[in-house]
């Protein structure tokens, strides 16, 4: 379930798939480069799902590079950065799944993040928004536009 390097991992543990992403974004009058890298981290506590499967959690590095090549922002995120939004019990069975650039919004860069079930077949996650200001400040909030854990039935508009 992940890219295995020369380092051998126990067969009973699962790695979440690695990814590296790079995007250009027009922000505050210039073109910035956003780099996002996700890796399993064997140093973080193991996740055990309801079926007893064990997973390594992820660390995601988010970097924003100025047009001149200098680094404006660089931070490693782990699930603990989002703990106040997901609850202690949910955190024990969830992983940091991903961070993606959403948009430049005035003086801020907005990123969608998700913490959820590490099984690739699951759609259980908590959506979050990371905002980075032009001064490098970071804020995190739950994304109220989506509710993946809703108990409400899905309704479709007919004739639309």
Mark where each language-model region is.
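Acidic, glycine-rich flexible loop segments
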Residues: 85-127, 132-133
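Surface-exposed acidic loop/strand-edge motifs in secreted or periplasmic proteins
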Residues: 2-96
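A short, polar/proline- and glycine-enriched secondary-structure boundary/capping micro-motif
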Residues: 84-86, 122-123, 149-156
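Short beta-strand segments
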Residues: 71-75, 124-128, 139-141
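Short, solvent-exposed coil/turn segments at beta-strand boundaries
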Residues: 28-31, 66-70, 104-110, 133-136
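Beta-propeller blade signature
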Residues: 58-66, 126-136
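A mature extracytoplasmic/lumenal domain signature
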Residues: 38, 66, 78, 113-117, ...
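Short, low-complexity, Pro/Ser/Thr/Gly-rich segments in the mature regions of secreted, periplasmic
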Residues: 136-160
């Amino acid at each position: 379930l992940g890219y295995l390097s020369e380092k051998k991992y126990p067969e009973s543990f699962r790695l979440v798939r690695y990814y590296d992403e790079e995007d250009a974004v027009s922000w505050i009058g210039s073109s910035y480069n956003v780099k996002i890298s996700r890796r399993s981290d064997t140093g973080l506590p193991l996740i055990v799902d309801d079926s007893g499967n064990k997973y390594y959690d992820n660390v995601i590095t988010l970097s924003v590079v100025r047009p001149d090549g200098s680094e404006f922002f660089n931070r490693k995120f782990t699930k603990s950065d989002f703990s106040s939004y997901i609850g202690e019990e949910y955190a024990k069975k969830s992983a940091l799944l991903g961070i993606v650039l959403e948009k430049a919004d005035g003086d801020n860069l907005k990123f969608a993040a998700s913490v959820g079930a590490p099984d690739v077949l699951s759609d259980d996650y908590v959506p979050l928004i990371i905002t980075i200001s032009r001064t490098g400040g970071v804020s995190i909030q739950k994304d109220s536009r989506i509710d993946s854990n809703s108990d409400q039935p899905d309704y479709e508009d007919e004739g639309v």
